[in-house]
Amino acid sequence: MKQDLHPKYTKVTVNCANCGNSFETRSTRPSIKVDICNNCHPFYTGKQMLVDTAGRVERFNKRFAKSTAAQAKAQ
């Protein structure tokens, strides 16, 4: 059998970018950074997070109105 075939499996610290929570696990990577963890995820906390979609919907409606106006003008 070949020696040193598998990567080293060591303890690493996982850091959450959202809440700053950190915990230890094992991995082949030197460090792990996650966007959201069990400490701040809405499913685990029971808190609803407001997602800013209103601005996107308004922008879409504005672009859609421009395209329909251009089509009506062309006909």
Curated annotation (Swiss-Prot):
GO terms for molecular function: rRNA binding; structural constituent of ribosome. Transmembrane segments: none annotated. The gene is rpmE. Part of the 50S ribosomal subunit. One of its GO terms (cellular component) is ribosome. GO terms for biological process: translation. PROSITE patterns: RIBOSOMAL_L31 (PS01143). It holds the Pfam family Ribosomal_L31. Belongs to the bacterial ribosomal protein bL31 family. Type A subfamily. NCBIfam families: L31 (TIGR00105), PRK00019.1 (NF000612), PRK00528.1 (NF001809). Keywords: Ribonucleoprotein, Ribosomal protein, RNA-binding, rRNA-binding. SUPFAM superfamilies: L28p-like. This is Large ribosomal subunit protein bL31. Binds the 23S rRNA. The keyword RNA-binding applies. It comes from the Bacteria. Coiled coil: none annotated.
